[in-house]
């Protein structure tokens, strides 16, 4: 599954194989619990879990309908490859129908899926399941003859189904992932030879009788016929051992181990005709010592069995009698190791079936052991049965008792009641339990804490007194009493302090040097004065306000008019070509042009800085001084008002002609019209 490490690929694979999976507690596919939980992923998993619950319910309904269709045909033929049995009568030796296991071991698919209709049983205290590559399914075909002996001498496959019940990380089937859920339904093999106290499972063979001698192996254990069969179930972390005892025969050695069959809550279907586990899987381990008796029965199981199964002493097989077909099969070959499956459901076990063990005569292909016959007596229930407590953790998974029995002897399909009007079979249901909700992440907790702190600060101060955030501590500035503005920035009164002495600088002179703020004393005596500006006029350090003009720095007291000596801080000023500073009034008085007519300086009008003057013959005139000297006509550029100078005098055209008629001087004749 390396290629499905990526959650996206694994989700895509799950969608493709949707019908191969069942919903589980962990969700739809594997989730890395160590990784941080993604809220989007959790929401997606919940949505898929809801959909899978609906799909699972539909599948359960379809299986229930299929079971209802199968029940009426139970008396006409075998169900799911089961044997068709004759009328309920005790058979003589060699006259019963024999259950034959044909085919060889075949490794299961990668998904290890078991067809619906097969009941998988596990026993407490038995070995773990085999590896997946060695698993095989055993399908048993029964004889179609109801009252005659098949006479089949074919070699039978000895099989056994048992599993140790050891605590695992999660014993609830809803806790298993989809792949593990089916893998854990794999086949198991006991370790008899190593541990004589291990409860043997169910074994099936031909050519074996009942033996009371040591070294014999118990064979298939059959439950007594009872129309009220119940589904044995167990919960996670606890188990109830369903065990039955068998009184010894004349040989006194027919003691059996606790059967301890646990029936899973999942119904599987198996198809007849598939190969079963063969002897190529290895020789069957045999016990060298007789089994010590051990009796246990489920709670409230006190009534005697209503029917007993006779045993055969001819060595040709085990005989099964009953009015309804009851196909029996052990779907697990014998292996030593493998994964364990811990499956649980909610209803307590109340099956009155008695389990007894017959011993296998020989491996497939071998004849029956001589002298291993023993008259069979029907199984009985021990009143002094040991009851193991069971705790149900999933009460919602319980099904109605008495409706059907999930075979505790490893048989295929549900055990059908022997009455013609059998009740409906209700399949066990399994609900999807969503995973626990994960708490908020560290980033969410930090964001929530910051938000709450900001809300507390906003609630502690009126919103009208909020000025903004301090550039030094980034906290809000509330109230004018602690607000300080300097260099265009907002500070707390306690944040705007001298970098050297930490004194508050609100309302005091400060010096900003290299990104730090200093008070005047620290600035003067800490060596920073070397970087201070010097006045352009006096040449001294500027320790107070700095006035910059024309690219130079001045003390405010040094920046004065050279004429009136008035301080020009905040007052319009001008300079001449010699860099002398003048106020505007003195500048015009000193540097303003003089009128050629009246000889006075031409100054700007009151309230204005602009000077209006008339320039004629390279001379400057006031506007009111530029007129005809004879008639006083205002001269300008209009027609009839043009100036006609004569001998450096200003005249209009008529006055100019008159001056010429009187005999102008030769100098006046050379005048040109302007």
From Swiss-Prot:
Q: List, as start-end ranges, the regions of compositional bias called Low complexity.
A: 98-109, 344-371
Molecular-function GO terms, alphabetical: metal ion binding; transcription corepressor activity
Q: SMART domains per the record?
A: LIM (SM00132)
Upper lineage is: Eukaryota, Metazoa, Chordata, Craniata, Vertebrata
Q: Which family does it belong to?
A: Belongs to the zyxin/ajuba family.
| The protein's name in its UniProt record | LIM domain-containing protein 1
Question: Quick one: where's region Disordered?
Answer: 73-109, 142-165, 204-388
State the organism of origin. Answer: Bos taurus
Polar residues bias: start-end ranges: 144-161, 232-244, 303-316
What are the residue boundaries of the LIM zinc-binding domain, all occurrences included? 468-529, 533-593, 594-662
Q: Which InterPro entries match?
A: Ajuba-like (IPR047172), Ajuba-like_LIM1 (IPR047245), Ajuba-like_LIM2 (IPR047247), Ajuba-like_LIM3 (IPR047248), Znf_LIM (IPR001781)
| Keywords assigned | Cell junction, Cytoplasm, LIM domain, Metal-binding, Nucleus, Phosphoprotein, Repeat, Repressor, RNA-mediated gene silencing, Transcription, Transcription regulation, Tumor suppressor, Zinc
Region annotation Interaction with RB1: where it falls in the sequence: 402-440
Residues recorded with modification Phosphoserine: 147, 235, 241, 271, 276, 314, 422
What is the role of this chain? Answer: Adapter or scaffold protein which participates in the assembly of numerous protein complexes and is involved in several cellular processes such as cell fate determination, cytoskeletal organization, repression of gene transcription, cell-cell adhesion, cell differentiation, proliferation and migration. Positively regulates microRNA (miRNA)-mediated gene silencing and is essential for P-body formation and integrity. Acts as a hypoxic regulator by bridging an association between the prolyl hydroxylases and VHL enabling efficient degradation of HIF1A.
| Region feature Mediates nuclear export, mapped onto this chain | 54-136
Any one Pfam family match given in the protein's UniProt record, by short name: LIM
PANTHER family, sorted: LIM DOMAIN-CONTAINING PROTEIN 1, LIM DOMAIN-CONTAINING PROTEIN JUB
This protein's record includes keyword Transferase: no
Top-level taxon in the UniProt lineage: Eukaryota
